[in-house]
């Protein structure tokens, strides 16, 4: 019985990890398609874009402090010069917000 329970726990963990990895990949693809043109492929905007639009890099303490929920709200509603990103499902918004938090 213990061996069977252990096997079920390992299987559940593997399925959860695979789901999280797919979610991160979806977030990366959405970021590349919808965000990277302004925020840069690694979260560091070009000098011109940073100056023109006031975009801070992900390494900025104020950006690092953002929660996933705050990033989701910005993606959905926009903030400052950033317009809302239209056409994304709630799952895509969450995925891109979680991906954004992984950028250094």
Pin down the residues of each PLM region.
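C-terminal capping alpha-helices of c-type cytochrome domains
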Residues: 74-75, 86-104
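Short leucine-rich amphipathic alpha-helices used at interfaces
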Residues: 69-71, 76-77
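Extracytoplasmic/secreted proteins, especially bacterial periplasmic and envelope-associated proteins
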Residues: 26, 30, 66, 70, ...
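Periplasmic/extracellular electron-transfer cofactor-ligation site
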Residues: 28-55, 77-83, 102-104
């Amino acid at each position: 019985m213990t061996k069977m329970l252990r096997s079920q726990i390992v299987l559940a963990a593997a399925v959860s990890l695979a789901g999280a990895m797919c979610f991160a990949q979806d977030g990366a693809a959405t970021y590349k398609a919808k965000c990277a043109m302004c925020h840069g492929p690694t979260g560091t905007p070009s000098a011109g874009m940073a100056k023109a639009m006031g975009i801070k890099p992900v390494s900025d303490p104020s950006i690092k402090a953002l929660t996933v929920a705050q990033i989701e709200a910005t993606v959905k509603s926009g903030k400052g010069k950033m317009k809302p990103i239209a056409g994304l499902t709630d799952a895509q918004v969450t995925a891109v917000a979680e991906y954004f938090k992984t950028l250094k």
